[in-house]
UniProtKB/Swiss-Prot annotation:
Pathway: Amino-acid biosynthesis; L-lysine biosynthesis via DAP pathway; (S)-tetrahydrodipicolinate from L-aspartate: step 3/4. It catalyses: L-aspartate 4-semialdehyde + pyruvate = (2S,4S)-4-hydroxy-2,3,4,5-tetrahydrodipicolinate + H2O + H(+). This is 4-hydroxy-tetrahydrodipicolinate synthase. GO terms for molecular function: 4-hydroxy-tetrahydrodipicolinate synthase activity. The keyword Cytoplasm applies. The gene is dapA.
Amino acid sequence: MTHLFEGVGVALTTPFTNNKVNLEALKAHVNFLLENNAQAIIVNGTTAESPTLTTDEKELILKTVIDLVDKRVPVIAGTGTNDTEKSIQASIQAKALGADAIMLITTYYNKTNQRGLVKHFEAIADAVKLPVVLYNVPSRTNMTIEPETVEILSQHPSIVALKDATNDFEYLEEVKKRIDTNSFALYSGNDDNVVEYYQRGGKGVISVIANVIPKEFQALYDAQQSGLDIQDQFKPIGILLSALSVDINPIPIKALTSYLGFGNYELRLPLITLEDTDTKVLREAYNIFKAGENE
């Protein structure tokens, strides 16, 4: 079975200028990603600062990306919230706008149990009838989708993948035992673990760093699929990832997207920009990475 995508899906940032969504910068960024081998684009997720976007802004961003991409790669809309009915309505609207799939985070704050998660995800999948990527990110939600729950959900015809941001390979192996990896894709949600994640059968990554190095990050996946040892190829990327870890995503990555010309270096509160010294160090790390490519 063909998966939704294989390789690098980009968790797209939202460019702002004077606190307004900058559509021209958004288009330029998406064109850059398409020209540099991104395999999917994920819109209105964590990296997009989605909690600070209005419903109208989310729909405008999604429509803009869908129209520009024009079916060249899948556009996946982040529509999950901790309110099932709101998630259903957002998912229905995403489908109406032309999204190829939706991504659903676990519930948060008003946390449920595993049975509640099953009901929540199945209700949305039943209502919208688009491919669904589950999103497990315990560090942000303080709950997980247990392997047994993934097994149940993987039986739903519309639930086709998991974005696994647990950074826990024991979890990955438990999930793998319980699913059909031919029909259900496992994507890493952690850029720094992709070498081992790919070795363990992951079909790709939903990536933050690919906002600025999509071609290089996709080349890593392609090399692994060709049977090459990618440890050395990953090392310079790993150094840049270490520089990106200076603060919470998406604060650092937007210091780089803005450096490439995709909007100002702006975030919406409660997120704030890096200190100037940290911004300078991060951008220099990016310059060193790019210079190393040309040696």
